[in-house]
Amino acid sequence: MVLAFVLVNCEMRVEKAVIDELKTFDAVKEAIGTFGVYDILVKLEADSDHKLRDVITQKIRKMDKVRTTTTLMIIQEWE
């Protein structure tokens, strides 16, 4: 499994609607509102980095109310 966190900035006062839509995507395991620089923290999990990339670029970044995203890919193992 490939894991990533996406930090989302969205338009003002639409955070709940964006979170609700994010939760409809299969790869999204959690979507929560935050205070600070970013509005939403999204935890994603997929079978491959290609599938994860597709969700981020073709779904999340193309949402009408999403302004910007920052993606953090997780290192699976340290040896």
Which stretches of residues belong to each language-model region?
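A compositional/biophysical signature of low hydrophobicity enriched in polar/charged and small residues
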Residues: 1-79
